Design a protein with these regions (language model features):
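Multi-pass membrane proteins that catalyze or facilitate reactions on polyprenyl-/lipid-phosphate substrates
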Residues: 1-216
C-alpha cells in the first residue's frame, strides 16, 4: 500500500481529530444529562434520546445509553456501600444459620428477586425483538405519551398510598414488585426510579423507605 502524501494526510488527521473532539463533547454533555436525571423520577433514557435530537446530533442508540449509565451505577454503589455491606453480611449469616428474621437479610433476598425481571425482560427484547432500537416505541411521540402517563401514576400514588411501611418490614415479594416496575424502564419515557417509587408508594411505603428500596 502506498503511503499517503503529506497533502492528503494533514486534512485527514485534522478531520479525525475534529471528529474525536466532537464525540467527546457529545459524550460529556450526555453524561451530564444522565447524571442530572438518573436520580430524579424522570426518565434519563428519554432525555438521552430527546436532548441529542434537539441539538441536532441524532439518536445516540441503545448501546451508548446503556454504557453511559455505568457512572450512575458506580455512584449508587459508592453512596450505599455501607447498606450493601450490611445486606451482604446479614444475607450470608441467614443462609448459614437458616434464619431470616434480620430485615437486612430479607432486604438481600428482595434485591436479588428485584434484579431478575429486568434481566429477563432485557434478554427477551434482545432475542425476540431485534428491531426494538428502531421501533416506534423509541420515537419522540411515544416517549412523550409514556412520560405523561408515568407522571400521572406517580402523582396518584402520592394521593392514595398509605406511606406507613418501613424497610424493617420488607418481604421478598416487595423486591419482586419493585423489580417488575423496574423492568418497565426498558421503555423510553419510563423512569427507573420513577416506576419503582410509584410501585412502592402504591404498596404503602413511606417516601424515604421507598426511595432507599428503589435505589438499592
Amino acid at each position: 500500500m502506498l503511503p499517503l502524501s503529506p497533502v492528503l494526510a494533514q486534512p485527514l488527521a485534522t478531520a479525525a481529530a475534529s471528529s474525536m473532539g466532537t464525540a467527546l463533547w457529545h459524550a460529556l454533555v450526555l453524561g451530564v444529562v444522565q447524571g442530572l436525571t438518573e436520580f430524579l423520577p424522570i426518565s434519563s433514557t428519554a432525555h438521552l434520546k430527546v436532548v441529542p435530537l434537539l441539538l441536532g446530533w441524532g439518536d445516540p442508540g441503545v448501546a451508548f445509553t446503556a454504557v453511559i449509565q455505568l457512572g450512575s451505577i458506580v455512584a449508587v454503589l459508592a453512596y450505599f456501600r455501607s447498606d450493601l455491606q450490611a445486606v451482604i453480611r446479614a444475607t450470608a449469616t441467614a443462609m448459614r444459620e437458616g434464619r431470616w428474621t434480620d430485615p437486612s437479610a430479607r432486604l438481600g433476598v428482595a434485591i436479588a428477586l428485584g434484579t431478575l425481571p429486568i434481566v429477563l425482560a432485557g434478554m427477551a427484547l434482545k432475542l425476540w425483538f431485534p428491531g426494538y432500537e428502531d421501533s416506534v416505541i423509541r420515537g419522540i411521540p411515544s416517549i412523550a405519551i409514556v412520560s405523561i402517563v408515568m407522571a400521572s401514576l406517580l402523582a396518584l400514588s402520592e394521593l392514595v398510598g398509605s406511606r406507613r411501611r418501613q424497610l424493617s418490614s420488607v418481604l421478598p415479594r416487595d423486591g419482586l414488585l419493585v423489580g417488575l416496575a423496574q423492568a418497565l424502564a426498558l421503555v423510553p419515557g419510563v423512569s427507573r426510579s420513577g416506576s419503582t417509587l410509584t410501585a412502592s408508594l402504591f404498596d404503602g411505603w413511606e417516601r424515604a423507605a421507598a426511595a432507599r428500596l428503589s435505589f438499592l
